[in-house]
Amino acid sequence: MSLRSLRALCLTSFFIADVRDGLGPFLGIFLTQRHWQAEDIGLLMTVGGVAGLLATLPAGFITDTSRHKRVLLAGVCLAITLTTLLLWFSQKTSVVALSQVASGICAAFVGPLIAGITLGLTRQRGFSAQMGKNEAFNHAGNFFTALIAGAIAWYWGIGGIFILMACTTLLTLVALLAIRGGDIDDDAARGIEAASTPSLPGFAILFRHTPLLIAGVTLMLFH
């Protein structure tokens, strides 16, 4: 595995923390300043969350079959940012609903894509350790960008959050480009370690393997 690609993956996890959730908690503040009612804000945020939940399963399938995970991750990051920036120009109900649904669907791809890229770089033997590093960088990214966002909102207003998100998106794309495509083993990213690996089980294994089904239901309820 390439040390450069692994470091770039950590930086990707750091910067993507601010991109993944769009405006995050600042969305409610932004819409309240535009004279939205709390119940309307809550409804549309719920719609976006439900859209993201429904997209989780197909996002996993698409990630598993894709051989262009970096490009796909760059695409969903750009889509989240662009649909969020729409809110600055229009706060119509239809525009906000479109933004939240699109952002929710795109955000569902981020976790599986990061996991797939990680597995493709480290194979199974190094996956757990690298995922731990990814999460550490991701939480650090959440912490620092929240501090910066709070300072920006305090001094320059909520509009500065849009600029911050655009900047972190650009930094995410730069970090993604630093991951060498040739370092990602697409077969390993799907759990295939060698040519002798038996064919991967299908979706039906969930219903034949009780512990796996319980784990899946638990994760679904968690979300």
Regions of interest found by a model, annotated:
Residues 2-49, 213-218, 223:
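Helix-loop boundary and gating motifs at the non-cytosolic
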Residues 71-85:
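Structural signature of the two symmetry-related core transmembrane helices
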Residues 1-3, 181-216:
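Juxtamembrane intracellular "pre-TM" segments in multi-pass secondary transporters
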Residues 43-61:
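Central cavity-lining transmembrane alpha-helices of secondary-active solute carriers
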Residues 88-99:
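Helix-loop junctions at membrane interfaces in 12-TM secondary transporters
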Residues 101-138:
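Cytoplasmic helix-loop-helix junction between adjacent transmembrane helices
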Residues 55-68, 153:
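Helix-to-loop junctions at the C-terminal end of transmembrane segments
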Residues 167-189:
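C-terminal membrane-cytosol helix-exit motif in multi-pass small-molecule transporters
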